[in-house]
Amino acid sequence: MSTVKKSSKKKSSKKSSSGNESSKKSSPKIVPKHTAKNLPKPIKNFEIDLDKCANCPGCLTYLSFIRQVENIIQQNSSRSTTTQLIVKLISNFVWKYRFTYEQIAVNLFKYKFKERGYLVKILVSLGFDPNNLKINGHKVLKILVYENDIPSIIALVENGANIDFGKAPSNILHICASRNYPVLLKYALSRNEIDINAVNIDGRSPLYLACLYLNKECIKILLDNGADVEVCTPDEKTCCLELIIFLGNIMHNNLEVYTEIYQRYGDKYSDNISELVGNIVDALKYIISAKNNMSRQEIYTIRNLCFNKPIVMNEKIVFDLFVFIMDKFPKIVYNKFTHLGHNAINTSIMFCNNSLIKYFVDKTDLDFQAINNNITNPIQMLVNHGYIDYVETILNRNPKIVSTKCRYNNNLLHYTLMPCYVYSNVPRIKSDKDIIELVKIFANNKKINQNHRNNSGYRPIEVAIRYCSIDVIKELLKYNTTIFAENRIKQQLFPVLNNNDIISFATQLGRFDVVTYLIQENVQFQLYQIDDIHTVPTALLIAIVYHRKNFIQFFLELPQITDCLNNDVTKEYVINFANMYSNYNVQITDTYNLNFIGNDKMSFTHRIDRMIHFYSVHYGYSKMVILSGLSTILSLLEKICLASKKCKNYRNLPNSKFLEATIFSNGPCDLTFRNEFSNLYTDINLLNYMNDSKFFDNIVEIIGDLIEYPILLDIFEYMFAVRDLPISSQPIIKFIESLGLINQSNKIIKINKIVNELLNKSEISIDLNDQDTHNYDDYVENDPEFDSDEFDTDEFSDEAIKDFFGLDNKNLLTDKTSSPIKPIKNNQKENFNKKIDKYRVENMLHKFCRGEKLPHYDIIYKCLMQTDYYQILDNKIVVHNNEIILAVIYKLKSSDSTNSQMSHKPSVKTNPSDWIKSYSTNICSPNKQDHYHMFPFVLDWILYKWSCVEFQTKDKIYPTEFNTHLYFYGELNTNGRMVKGCFEYFLNCHKSLYHRLFHEIDRVPPQIQRKIYNH
């Protein structure tokens, strides 16, 4: 007995100590987990310490209470009697041992007492509130939910406990969905007390959590009870999108996904990824079955999932998934699967997914033309990728599809010959055999015009020369007997746009095999017109410009060439042409033949300067624009080389993302030239030039001449081909490496340095935004397109205008015999001329030099370079020639609040909104060289800061753009007398001056007179 007492004291001491520690905390610590054989095993989430209460008097007392309750229930068959006895027992227990109803209830659930529901009901009748049942601040009901103790949960809920946890981070639905408690989930939903779409603290719905943890039975239960599949998380993910992304990461073997798998599922799928994939697909099918439609983001993600070749899973799995989606949403095939508008059929072809391609072709109800005209449609892509069998199947089904509209004005024969760029890890090679078979299909079709030109000026034959083997070219020429019958454009050396000199074209591209074949077939040379009498084969000039020495030697041996060069004028022209535009020194041999000697020691600077000079003279591009274009492309090539080098050594670093996102995703023009180089040469609208295929080709040709031309051509063709299509980084890296561009990096850096030095030396800072290719000669002079009903037709007398402006003709030296004006201080002619840059004048007159220089070029050039004297006063500008006054321009008072505001009615401006950037070729033409057209050109340099009457009219050639009409009021010396009127400057929408004329005041439109009078 003493031993027992001693042990009891010791135990009591421990209990007392434990009680003191507990009293310091905010809430009493519930008796934790124990292993005493005489006590039942408690629930683990009640945090019970097994060792502390093996012989705890409280636990033993409670055990005694439980046994008494069990005895009462067993000994009494009457429920009412049993209830009365238990109530009496509880009352004695509470009074004797100071237990609360809550403590009794906690222990009921802690030890899973069999009749806990019955006892809870009795406790509630005694005043117990089940909603206040907590352990360490946590509701017992929530703990029971985590334990999936359904009987205990029912005992509490059926006796008044609220099944909703209130504002807790997760409710019972979230817990059941994430822990896969389908039975409890059904019970909770049957209560209809909780919103099935309620989100937890992380913004996730029960359905989203069930999908996240792949609890398929819970997914089905939630969907059957009306769960919304479109509920989004804070980062705008639906459960469908989450499953697609997760499956895509597994499919592409994303290394980060394995960490995510372990965090979600532990070791469950560590050795069985196929089971995981199967569960994801099953869950995804449940969700898709419940959807009414799919969002654009979900469609884009499905594209990457279903069309890319899987790495770690069977292709049939994603194929079956897409077929399932198609059965649910048949029209999804025509939805945009890329931001550019490619549909599902296009995407399957781009990714060479043969299973899906066959599936689409076999579906007879699909329309292979149903796509917007801005992108290539499916039939064009099938042709371009060389799927002969599928093409024949579709053509047999719908023969009219052969005349379908094509992007960039290509026909199906163009697509047959164009290169095929693939975007998957399994490239599709379009062989010569495939191309020839397709040529046979389309070349015999009467609905396809073999001489049709696309937007780049290419016929199918030019496309073949650029991309295909000689065998394909021979096959194509068999079916086209009219290929050489077109009218040829003379005075054009660059033969790409709208020209059919295919010998020159092949020479430019370095296709010696094509040139020799064409000569054997007696194809005629195009002749470049030197003057009215003498000509020279264009191909020879092209060979000189692009340094094709083997071509030059071949041409010089041909009778057609030697006959031309027998003429001294032609021979001298060729010699001068070579010395001016190439790195060849040309000598005349003893036999009076030409000997081309390559100057390998010529510096890059000299070669670049010659090439720039050639393109400036023949195509009207300014030196500044050409240098800017060269710098932009060379800088891009530097970046490609740098990124490629890093990718080669560090495949998983973000350098491949540069190649994917920066260069190829949105195309070289839209992204590279706009974003990467947006800070370059802001005074020049370089992007407009880079979007001009002719200018871009010219720039590529210049750089190609300085480095290896085929490499450069291939890379830019690749860039332009893939700009509209999704592409992964690895094919890009492999393609760049195969080109050998990295080996040219030092040369590229050197050339770019030279170009930038030339650019820095240039003092030109003029905005060359003029993309105008029209001369505007058809514009009618004095045709402002006014509505005459809006204005009065009053004419104003000289006296009225004189009184308003306070003018006195006597003070203007209008008398013919008046004394000459003395030289004006601070206005020396020499100083002004120094400000006029001849390059700027040449740029403004570049239209006069397209092809053959126009005869009146020298006249207008001289007028702009040799200006008269002028003096700017407060209220007027006086132009003179040191002897007499030539013109006077008066200042008008502007009442406009802004000068930038576009107005379709006449208004007085402080200075013009726009000014001259170039001259149309009708200016100073032979019928416009009278005194009224040729008033002092010095005004063209100074009136851009002077007040005028201005208004805008719609451009006749570009209806969405506007022309600017400017009227400067003043006087012009005409036959020795000063005549009042307006100096008229009309600019088209590209700021090209197409009308320059002085009108006497009575011939000025009345509405303009009215504005002058009112101001």
From Swiss-Prot:
Residue ranges, annotated region (Disordered): 1-37
Compositional bias of kind Basic residues: 1-14
UniProt entry keywords in alphabetical sequence: ANK repeat, Repeat
InterPro entries: Ankyrin_rpt, Ankyrin_rpt-contain_sf
Nuclease among keywords: no
Gene3D superfamilies: Ankyrin repeat-containing domain (1.25.40.20)
Top-level lineage group: Viruses
PROSITE patterns the UniProt entry points to: ANK_REP_REGION, ANK_REPEAT
A Pfam match: Ank_2
Ranges occupied by ANK repeats: 136-165, 168-201, 202-231, 340-370, 374-403, 456-485, 498-527, 535-564
Name recorded for this polypeptide: Putative ankyrin repeat protein R96
